[in-house]
Amino acid sequence: CASQGQKCKTKSDCCNGMWCAGTRGHTCYKPK
């Protein structure tokens, strides 16, 4: 899976239930 800050296409690409979003290409991040 993708770590925080890594590129992703969907939320399922990210580790630990992190979200996938971004304006300049999606990356994984921890929701607040």
UniProtKB/Swiss-Prot annotation:
Compartment(s) where it occurs, according to its Swiss-Prot or TrEMBL record: Secreted; Nematocyst
Superkingdom as given in the UniProt entry:
Eukaryota
- Primary place of residence? secreted
Q: List the disulfide bonds.
A: 1-15, 8-20, 14-28
- Protein keywords: Disulfide bond, Ion channel impairing toxin, Nematocyst, Neurotoxin, Proton-gated sodium channel impairing toxin, Secreted, Toxin
| Molecular-function GO terms, alphabetical | ion channel regulator activity; toxin activity
Q: What are the GO cellular component annotations?
A: extracellular region; nematocyst
The note filed under miscellaneous reads:
Negative results: has no effect on voltage-gated sodium channels. Not toxic to crabs when administered by in vivo injection (2mg/kg crab).
What the protein does?
A: Reversibly inhibits acid-sensing ion channels (ASIC) in rat dorsal root ganglia neurons (IC(50)=100 nM). Reversibly inhibits voltage-gated potassium channels (Kv) in rat DRG neurons (IC(50)=3.5 uM).
**Know the name of this protein?**
Pi-phymatoxin-Pcf1a
Recite the lineage of the species: Eukaryota, Metazoa, Cnidaria, Anthozoa, Hexacorallia
